[in-house]
């Protein structure tokens, strides 16, 4: 492992249903990620600007999935907790946002900062589940969404990132449904269209490699993008940054991975290059 990474305080824990990031914010343009983002300042404050004209300053913001926004920080680094929408009840986001916008917001901001310190100290210890991370950050696990087994299987196919590209037709066939019926079921269950879901998961998969010295054109193909131009446009849309800027700002980022979402989670695997 690179000494610079080993000594860095920047870290990212990637889980199937959560991401905990504490590191450089960069200078992002407008972004539109496909998951709920809870931003917390490490020092100073944050500024959130939304596509509908909203402009607010504070130490904590919760932004729902697929909402265009720009986030900036007084300090170079910030914390971001990412929650995948298909993993929690449909009303969980609104309930959490309500809590965070009220008197509890400051308490939760403190919890998330404490979670950062705790995760930093636990680098070489046992793994952590989504429920445990939720409790560290929000005081309790977020209510889980119950999904149709056919949708669960299709999600597992989408996030495998190996072999032939996953299509709605292939998932529908595996589920024993027509393509139109499957697409309806998928959106009904997850609240997201199949196409948007697949695009977000593909962009999210990039995070696993963010601190590595890779040929980006080859990485784009490996992840499933048809070409480098499509790759760059997609990443900029979701993250507000070009792929090269993400990799440049992640050189000293220690990346950890917890492979399962529930109880019995495996220990972290460090991917620090």
Where are the language model's segments positioned?
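…primarily DNA-binding HTH/wHTH and HhH modules…
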Residues: 5-9, 211-212, 222, 230-273
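Glycine-centered loop/turn positions within well-structured domains
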Residues: 69, 192, 204, 217, ...
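An amphipathic alpha-helical interaction segment
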Residues: 82, 101-163, 169-183
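Basic/polar phosphate-binding segments, predominantly the helix-turn-helix DNA-binding elements
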Residues: 169-198, 220-245
């Amino acid at each position: 492992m690179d000494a610079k990474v080993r000594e860095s305080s920047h870290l990212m824990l990637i889980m199937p249903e959560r991401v905990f990031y504490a590191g450089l914010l960069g200078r992002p343009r407008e972004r539109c990620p496909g998951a709920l983002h809870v931003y917390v300042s490490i020092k100073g404050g944050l500024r959130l600007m939304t596509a509908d004209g909203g402009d607010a300053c504070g130490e904590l913001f919760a932004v729902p999935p697929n909402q265009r926004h720009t986030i900036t920080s007084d300090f170079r680094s910030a914390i971001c907790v990412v929650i995948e929408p298909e993993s929690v009840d449909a009303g969980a986001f609104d309930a959490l946002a309500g809590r965070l916008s009220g008197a509890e917001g400051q308490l939760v901001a403190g919890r998330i900062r404490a979670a950062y310190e705790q995760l930093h100290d636990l680098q070489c210890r046992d793994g952590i589940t989504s429920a445990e991370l939720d409790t560290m950050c929000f005081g309790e696990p977020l209510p889980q969404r119950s999904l149709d087994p056919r949708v669960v299987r299709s999600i597992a196919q989408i996030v495998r990132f190996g072999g032939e590209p996953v299509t709605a037709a292939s998932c529908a066939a595996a589920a024993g449904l027509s393509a139109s019926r499957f697409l309806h079921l998928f959106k009904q269950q997850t609240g997201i269209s199949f196409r948007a879901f697949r695009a977000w998961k593909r962009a999210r998969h990039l995070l696993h490699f963010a601190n590595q010295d890779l040929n980006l054109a080859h990485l784009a193909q490996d992840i499933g993008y048809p070409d480098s131009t499509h790759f760059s446009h997609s990443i900029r849309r979701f993250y507000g940054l070009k792929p090269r800027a993400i990799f440049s700002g992640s050189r000293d980022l220690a990346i950890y991975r917890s492979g399962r979402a529930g109880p019995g989670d495996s220990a972290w695997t460090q991917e620090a290059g």
